[in-house]
Amino acid sequence: TARVLAANGITACMYPRLEPTPALSWAVRYLGCGAGVCVTASHNPAKYNGYKVYGADGCQITLEAAEKILAAIEKIDCFDDVRLADFDAAAAAGRIVTIDEKCLDDFVQAVYDQRVGDGAGIDALKLVYTPLNGTGLECVKKLLKKLGVTHVTVVPEQEKPDGDFPTCPYPNPEIREAMQKGLELCDKVRPDLLLGTDPDCDRCGTAVPDGKG
């Protein structure tokens, strides 16, 4: 996508690593971009990898805007009409730009600023977290650290990004099956809370002990 944009004279700003979809929405406004694009299967099976488009306001585009984009796509030959720039050449020319770390740090801070309550006793919270082989690990751990949550155990099989979702074919943390690895780890660690985020980290699921084992 960045190479196509660059080839058409549009500057593309990219995070240096995989980051959550909300961090893209933030970056669109933070950097004053005209639009944002995220390629993701979200909480769906890997075969449904898709294309999320955001407007200049950082919100997902409306159906009307999507229909206009689709109409433009249908006018071109996807084999012959698509321009593609060389990545390194486009970067050297300033058409592909790496987003500065401050953008992500300010995003985490903005999320932190929305906290409710004074956080009393939160430093004693024992937590198991799973990013479900997605993008949430970096931002979630940074946020938890800011909140004072230090007793965090990450589900090892689901810690690193893997677009095939090998441990969880349907990675929706609102569904018990998606949280199974986390629940199994909870049986060993006995935390106060299990937290899971879907692969693009824009929805979460939680579980707490019910006192029945």
What residues fall within each predicted segment?
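Short, function-defining helix-loop hinge/capping sites that tune catalysis or transport
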Residues: 138, 206-208
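Residue-level signal for short segments within beta-strands and strand-turn junctions
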Residues: 55, 208-210
